[in-house]
């Protein structure tokens, strides 16, 4: 291939460029914002260039591989590489982070630190999606927590310290199990630790040990993904965080759990995955209904959207555990699709909060007249969230359903039952989405507007630009899902060739 260290540059550029922010003058908010956005755009362009010119779509193996010895006595390598599974999340990360820095334009307090943390998050996420070493994977997983914690506890709402502490306790607690799984897999069967993904994939484990490893990894991912009952940090965190942080949380952070589930649990522990799958499918189906019905009872707008993302994650779990290539492709499509839709909904909730300073739905009403643009975009993304045909959510959920129904692993009756339960969840989704729209935008005005100038009150060009930038891929993927599916389809076949009952 080519020996140029593209991936190291892509992972390292944001955080190294971010450290330069601290040398900027203290008062130069505008310079800092423009600098951060330029770094994000440059990073996105480099990623797109590497993807277009140095990446073969039809090759299911690892590409652009880099392997540098890092710590000698522990056989710890800086080992990066991408394949069809990680390209989608990496491009999504670049896209959403660039738009989130643009969304964070109103942040003026400690703006140097804020923008540095955004860039540090960017590095951690791309490092996680492209790491090929178990310990490096874990380090990137942990590195992600520090910027999120600081962004939450410094730029959040009234109860920000409570929600930030809850977030760090949950995720750090899950990471302990993750670390035990990583070290157990690395140290098994030899005196030297083998942390390489390739050697771990070819390593046969006893089934009992494999189940133990699987369970450790699963708890770590169940906090991040979130899988019920480990999801309670998510509504609190989303309810308090600044909306640009919410975009990164909903758009990328939740996808890290799903990515880890496929990358480590499915690829490296196939026997245990086939044992755990039926139970996880049941949990996923319960999660879809539970989160959708809980969302209906939320007064807080952001918490309602947060529960809707928990509900959508249920489809990812079902797709991953159906163990068919259709289902797994559908899960990856749902990851990308929800990354766009969730980020957009939180962004629009935040911009409307900036305008009216209300967060409870029963205090709002009649906002559609003074804010027609925000109303239009909010309605469009709510429709995408409830899987309207022609939008990406519909394509993803349809492919997941097909994957579940065509699965060889399950008997017909359980498949019909699970499909029925998830269909009820899909009926509940429009109920909470449309009631949210009705409470916010329709009805009578219940509050006094701060400014009489109506043109200032509606969405400005910046907000409109961010919304349209997210809306175009949602429509594009909905009309032609092969944009995303063509990335992962060969890799998915390679993963599923390990499963013995196909």
UniProtKB/Swiss-Prot annotation:
Cellular component terms (Gene Ontology): chloroplast thylakoid membrane
EC number(s) given by UniProt: 7.1.1.-
Molecular-function GO terms, alphabetical: NADH dehydrogenase (ubiquinone) activity; ubiquinone binding
GO biological process: one example: ATP synthesis coupled electron transport
Subcellular location: Plastid, Chloroplast thylakoid membrane
Topology term for the membrane: Multi-pass membrane protein
Pfam families for the chain: Proton_antipo_M (PF00361)
Keyword Hydrolase: no
Keywords: Chloroplast, Membrane, NAD, NADP, Plastid, Plastoquinone, Quinone, Thylakoid, Translocase, Transmembrane, Transmembrane helix
UniProt-listed InterPro entries: NADH_Q_OxRdtase_chain4, NADH_Q_OxRdtase_chainM/4, NADH_UbQ_OxRdtase, ND/Mrp_TM
Family in the record: Belongs to the complex I subunit 4 family.
Protein name: NAD(P)H-quinone oxidoreductase chain 4, chloroplastic
Organismal lineage: Eukaryota, Viridiplantae, Streptophyta, Embryophyta, Tracheophyta
Gene: ndhD
